[in-house]
């Protein structure tokens, strides 16, 4: 018996086979390359877009295996979207196999691929393994789709760019592409007869449950699937909020920042404040805060800081009131992880919501002025100016930095009331209603991450609180007695302003957060010398609505009054 001859071709090490009018392996016709098996390995290229003149339409008749190989439909000018390569056989891809092509996608677009055109890979047999589809834009940059399509409140897809007639599993072909806006484009698929077709989408589909619902429910019109965001977008949108939380944590409340300074009126039988030359203080602080957005974006921040200050002027009046005026320097850092509830992989919403992280550093200068009345009432005024530096790191490896500044103004008042009668040198309880209003302004410099322009602009925050502090002041006997303080605190905080949307390319993206939350805490101050104290404060906060805000923070400090 006569054996049928076979032709098996192995290409490797970057070798390129250009399909053109004379490229037929067995010269069957001018557009067909005929073989039994073709293996592409180690960067070898099957080039189906050799010419810029007219549409390239070739047939590779046989089975193709791509082991880190490349099927190329990207023509030399990168500006033609009508090339077609048909593999008339079966196909497998492995080890980072690629398909490179040109795709154009303009607005407005629709679910069926209107306003899009593309090169196409058509496989008549089966397909297996995994192959990455990479769109090449007009400048030759990979993973960017040409055109001006942008996120809108409707489903947006392209025409199919890979068509498989035979059996193949979803995810055989995958890919992601950038836009110059907030959206990311992902390759997804749908059944088409006995096979499957792959297309680019801007919308994330939910995972379809495998088990049927029992009892069955009547069908309803599905909501519009959410837009797929680029992994950098949550950080770009939420970083101004993270910067503000760092500013608020640095300023804090009077008792977190300074402990109990009424001891100037109590210690040494009320004579401590009369000859005080100044007070030097320092503290370290830490905070963990988890915030969910009302729409889709969440973040978790860990804040650390150190603060050193000095009151260069302490003034005491004849009526027993005293005033402290001083400055402080602070360094703070915030490490923030960002999340997207609709993060998608291959066009399907993923269980892994993490999108990237950000690091914020701040250097702050503060000016303080605190006034205590003879009855213990106080007014605390603070102005704080901060230099900010942010560094963004998305899970895709995009690494970019920016600078900015922040300014904070705070006014806090309180009035203590004795809960039991006691002499000035006796222990006693008191209750102190408090209120505070903080205005913060953050301005971040715009930047370009290499794909899109990001402008967060200026953001303003107005945060207020009302609360109460219950304190026990224990005073030792003797001429030089010191005052040890223990207290509990409860507050209601409220944000009066919502963050503004951020411009990302031609898109604007915003997020809103919990506006009201409760806080409880404990604090202590102990004398460690005739004129020195250590103090500490720890607090827990939780939202009072349906949107999550959950966190805890603490500080420990030391202060010394100079005589």
Region spans (language model):
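Extracellular beta-strand/loop-rich repeat segments of large surface/secreted proteins
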Residues: 1-157
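Intrinsic-disorder/low-complexity regions
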Residues: 9-12, 36, 46, 62, ...
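Intrinsically disordered, low-complexity segments enriched in small/polar residues
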Residues: 12, 41, 46, 52, ...
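Short regulatory "switch" loops immediately downstream of catalytic or recognition motifs
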Residues: 18-24, 48-51, 74-75, 103-108, ...
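Membrane translocator/pore-forming domains, dominated by Gram-negative outer-membrane beta-barrels
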Residues: 22, 30, 34, 39, ...
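Short beta-strand element of the conserved SAM-dependent methyltransferase core
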Residues: 64-65, 90-91, 121, 152, ...
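Intrinsically disordered low-complexity regions specifically enriched for long asparagine
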Residues: 83, 87, 221-228, 413, ...
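Outer-membrane translocation/initiation segment of Type V secreted surface proteins
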Residues: 100-106, 111-112, 117-118, 134-323, ...
